[in-house]
Amino acid sequence: MTDADIQILEKKLWKTADDLRQGAGLKASQYAQPIFGLIFLRFADNKYRRFEPQIKAEYEKRKGKLTERPLKEIAIRTCGFSLPDCARYDYILSQPASSLAKVIHDAMEAVESDNEDLRGVLPKNVYSQIGQSKDENLLKKLVQNFKDIPDDVEIDVFGKIYEYFLGEFSLKEGQGGGEFFTPTSVVQYMVKVLKPTGGRILDPACGSGGMFVQAARYMHAKGGIDLSVCGVEKDGETVKLARMNLALNNVNGTIYNANTFYEDPAKSFGNYDYVMANPPFNVDGVNYASVQNEPRFNSYGIPRNKSKQKKGTDETVPNANYLWINLFATSLKPKGRAALVMPCGAESAGDSELEIRRRLVEAGIIKQLTVLPGNMFNTVVLPAMLWFFDRAKPDTPKRDEVLFVDARKIYTQVDTTHRKFTEEQQRCLALITRLYEGDGEEYARLKADLAAASAAARSAMEARLADERRLAEQAAATLLGKANAKKLAKAKERHEKTIAEIKKAAEAEIARLEGHLAWIKENFPEGKYRDVTGLCRVAKIKGEGGIEENGWSLNPGRYVGVVQEIDTTTPEEFRAKMQAMYAEFATLSAEAHEIEKRIAENISRIASGASGSRSSSNSSGSSLSSNSGGSRTSSSSRKGPAR
C-alpha cells in the first residue's frame, strides 16, 4: 500500500469506529482500550497467517522425533508469538454478538497464557462495557470494521494504524490525551536531530511508546537494527498501550510500570546512548528527601523553595522540570545524546533553577534549543521547547556555544486549533543542525529530493490531465454521434472543472515543494551553516551578547532576533487601499443604520402591542417573533465580517 492508501484506510477505520462510538453513547475514554485490543488481535492474526505454513511444516517434520517441540514453542521462535485457535480473527468474528465480549476475553487470556512477554498487556476485561452500550451489536460491528484491513497488507501498516488511533484518541480526550501521546511530527523532528544509529534508548516518561517507535523506524530506514528500548510509565493502563505499540511495530524492549521520581527500574545513571522524552510539565509535590541523595537528580542541583517549610510538613520540590532535565543529562553514556520536550519558561526560570542551568551550560553538554510553534500539542496551546544534549560536545570546539533555532513560523495548519510539521519541514529544520555539525551531504540530498519530488508531481499532473482529456474526447465523440448538444455541453463543463481541480491541486503541491527548495537556497546559499536572523543563531557562553550576559537564559528569542518587516507599499497603493476601506466602512454604516431603523420599528410594535388587548398582544407576539428573529439574524450576519 502507498502512504496515500494507508491514510485513506486509517481515516475510514477511524470514522466507522467513532461513528459507532457516538451512536452507542460511549465516551472516548471508554472506547480506546477495546479498540487497541482489536487492532492487536487483527495484527496478530495477520502476521501469524504469514508464518503458519512454515510453523506447521517444522512441527510435522519434528513430530515423533527426539527434536519434537510443541507447536507453541516453534511459533514463538518463528513468528515471535503463539496464536491459539480461539484467538484467530475469523473465529472471533463468527461468534454471536451476545457472547462476543466473553469470546474476546478468552482469546486474549489464551494469548497471554501462551506468550510470557504479553502477560498482563492485553485489555481483556474491557469488552463487557461495550456489550452493555445502547447498540447491542456494537462490538460485532467493531470486530467487522477491523476485518476490513486487507489480509495482504504490509505488517508495519498495523503499527501506523495503531499510531493514528492513538493520535485521534488523544485529540478526543483533550488534556488527558497529552499524558500518553506526543504528536508524531514533533517526535520525528526530534529523532532527525538526534540521529540515533543503534544502542540503548531510555524514555523515563514513555506514555504509549511513540518515541521508541519513531526512533526504530528512523533506524530501520537508515539500515540500523541494533536497538534496545527501555521505558518507564507510572500509569498501568498506559503501560499496556506502550507494550502493544512495541509489539505491533516489532520493537524489542521493556516497559516498567513505575514512578520515575521514586523508582529507578531502568538503572538510568550513565547507562544509555539516547534519552528521548516528553515528561509531564510543571509537576509539584515531589518529596525532596526522596531525591536529594540520588545522583541522577542531584548532579547539577535540585530546585528548592525559597521560603522555609512549615513545621510538620515534608519539603517538596517546587517544580520538577529541572528534576527531569537532570535525569536526562545524567542518564547518558559519555557520548550519549538526548532530546526532550519542556514547557516554554523552563529555559529562563530563575532562583535555584537558574543555578542548575548555569552548571549545565558551563559543562558544555547543552547542544541546541528549538522553540516550537504554538498549537503543536493537543493539550498545550503555547509554544513548547525542545532541549538537545550531547555528552560528546565538551570534547569538541563547540563546547562553549549553543545552537538556538526558532521554528515558530514553520508549520502546517491541520485545523483551526492544531498544527504539525510536514516531512519536508522536519528535514529543513533538521538541516540547520546538520549544517551546524558540518554535514553538507544532507544539504545536497535534501535539495535533490525536493527537486525530484517537484518533477514527479508535475509528471503526475500531466499524466492525469492527459487521461482526463482522453476521457473528454471519448465522451464528446459519443455524444456528438448522438447529436445531443445539451449533454455534450454539460460533459464539457464537467471535464473542464475536473481539469481545473487537477491543475490547482498539483500546482499547489509543486509550489509547496519549490517553496522549501527556495527556503534552503535563501537561508543557506553556500550549503554551510550561518546565523539567520529570526531563524537560527549560535551563541557563545561568554562575551558580548553571550549566554552569561543574558542571565543564563536559553530562550532562543533572545539570541535569534526578529526579522524587520519592511513596508514597500507605494503612495498610490496606500491611497487605493484607504479608499477601498472607506467604501467598505460607508457600506457597513448604511447597513447599520438600516438595522437600527428595523430595531426601532420592532420596539414600536412591542409598545403598541402592550397597550392593546390580551388577544391582540398574543397576535402581535407571533409577528414579533418572526421580525425580531430576522433582525437578530441580520445583525449577527453583519457583525462577523466587521470584526
Positions of the model-derived regions?
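Non-catalytic, mostly N-terminal accessory regions of nucleic-acid modification and defense proteins
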Residues: M1-L194, T254-E263, S268, V371-G374, ...
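Conserved Class I SAM-dependent methyltransferase catalytic core
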Residues: Y31, I35-G37, M190, Q309-F389
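Active-site lining segments that contact anionic ligands and/or coordinate catalytic metals
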Residues: Y31, Y272, N319-A320, K335-V341, ...
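Feature representing long, continuous alpha-helical segments
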Residues: V213, K240, A277-P279, Y322-N326, ...
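Conserved catalytic motifs of ABC-family nucleotide-binding domains
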Residues: D284, Y288, Q292-P318
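C-terminal, active-site-flanking charged/polar segments
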Residues: I365-I366, M376-G438
